[in-house]
Amino acid sequence: MAKNIQAIRGMNDYLPSETAIWQRIEGTLKNVLGSYGYSEIRLPIVEQTPLFKRAIGEVTDVVEKEMYTFEDRNGDSLTLRPEGTAGCVRAGIEHGLLYNQEQHLWYIGPMFRHERPQKGRYRQFHQLGCEVFGLQGPDIDAELIMLTARWWRALGISEHVTLELNSIGSLEARANYRDALVAFLEQHKEKLDEDCKRRMYTSPLRVLDSKNPEVQALLNDAPALGDYLDEESREHFAGLCKLLESAGIAYTVNQRLVRGLDYYNRTVFEWVTNSLGSQGTVCAGGRYDGLVEQLGGRATPAVGFAMGLERLVLLVQAVNPEFKADPVVDIYLVASGADTQSAAMALAERLRDELPGVKLMTNHGGGNFKKQFARADKWGARVAVVLGESEVANGTAVVKDLRSGEQTAVAQDSVAAHLRTLLG
């Protein structure tokens, strides 16, 4: 007997019992994006490997350890996208969307990283990202954060996420800080773990993000990034903070927040939660004003963020159980008796025409009334429309409210109007 083929570790199937809540959450997110005037862009899952090496940075964990890279039949090195920003910038340059233009874009889809699978973090995971091009003031940074705050309110999780902010300054300011940080770390090398020693010269700002308690204690005496900011970055950050305060959005300045990708400058932010066990990031982003030019385009200011949907779904389910999936079926059409099926299917099509927003399922495979009503319950239907031989003969149908048990005989021409009243 052939061995069953199973899904790859860390790449999950999402079954109908799970996708319904995903659809409702994604619908909520997309509605808010539409209310801000953002447009969807759809991007390839596979890109040329040099795109990510140039955008993310060759000495980052993502590029060094986590990318799914392979050679195609033409000998080209290709990579399954580990994040969405690089591909979005590439598309913007390629199609002439960016130079001297303003773009407000969003995308959604699977990303791939070869990490150790754990709760809320998988090798194939789903992200929703937002990218804005052509605007350099702190007001657009603030709008993106306000947009995310509106998401949390719509999903009922506002009390379970907190905002952390930082400014990592200009490239020049960061280079000066990097030198000071490396000098400090060299003086205390014996207190660093092996991972921090490796990062000390390749990506020293990532040491600030270490989860090692001993390293974190050491960093209390390290030079502060805020002391090395250029004046323009200070003004930008102060403007952002003022806008958030005016909007009533609470935040904490975290001077060790640097983000794991090399393309960021100035504003960086994360929404974090403690409601899934250990602290986890729900949504994160920042400015990347140099990335478009770095990838071959003309200098264009840019800011954006990305959010992992697996972790967001877990959070909504954990803290807001009242946020339930929409029912799969609103109306279940029950038909029993000789020659009733064709009449039932014709009525179902007419009702779909007259009630386009309603989800209606027709019973197939026969069965007595008891079995068919059991199927209606299984699918979560609120109402059953019943056709038997007598109803077909006299042009009526029975409409039954499956919650109250009340039922009414209605002329078939009036069924849609009756259902509209019943379903509200």
UniProtKB/Swiss-Prot annotation:
State the name under which the record lists this protein: Histidine--tRNA ligase
Q: Identify one Gene Ontology CC term for this UniProt entry.
A: cytoplasm
Catalytic reaction annotation:
tRNA(His) + L-histidine + ATP = L-histidyl-tRNA(His) + AMP + diphosphate + H(+)
Any GO molecular function: ATP binding
Instruction: Show the NCBIfam families listed in the entry.
Output: hisS
Q: Which domain of life is it from?
A: Bacteria
Please list the GO biological process terms of this entry.
histidyl-tRNA aminoacylation
Naturally occurring in which organism (per UniProt): Shigella dysenteriae serotype 1 (strain Sd197)
Q: Give the family from UniProt.
A: Belongs to the class-II aminoacyl-tRNA synthetase family.
Per UniProt, which keywords does this protein have? Aminoacyl-tRNA synthetase, ATP-binding, Cytoplasm, Ligase, Nucleotide-binding, Protein biosynthesis
Known EC number(s)?
6.1.1.21
Q: Where in the cell is it found?
A: Cytoplasm
Subunit structure comment from the entry: Homodimer.
